[in-house]
Amino acid sequence: MSNTITLRGLSTISFWAADLEAAKKWYTELFGFKPYFERPGYFEFRLGDTQAELGVIDSRYAPTNSAASPAGTVVYWHVDDVKATFEKLLSMGATTYEEPVERGPGFVTASVVDPFGNILGIMYNAHYLEVLESIKKA
């Protein structure tokens, strides 16, 4: 039996916020630019080397079985300096979920909880840079 499902890449990462305007202001300050798409109850940024989408949805629309506290999968965004990014996030009101940890040569991770209860992972990933470079050469 062949696998007919092919995951081709992340298309949108969704966060929730009870105060959408405060979340928009916070993430706009973090990224240094405004969302590229907005509609009532939702806004979206395009980020990084692959222009991944990060959408923030009014928490009124969250599934009824959503956790009340941070939980679930952590999506890690590549950054060039984990410690500096971690400190910036904390200075903006995020709280520590996991301090920076070296996972091996060329791999450092950390994560915070944003002021709206979402886990935001950051990572320096040497493999990510190698893959990105190979894509540029192709």
Give the ranges of each region predicted by the language model.
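Vicinal oxygen chelate
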Residues: 1-10, 34-78, 86-113, 124-138
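Conserved active-site tyrosine of GNAT-family acetyltransferases
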Residues: 23-28, 89, 117
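Short glycine-/small-residue motifs
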Residues: 119-122
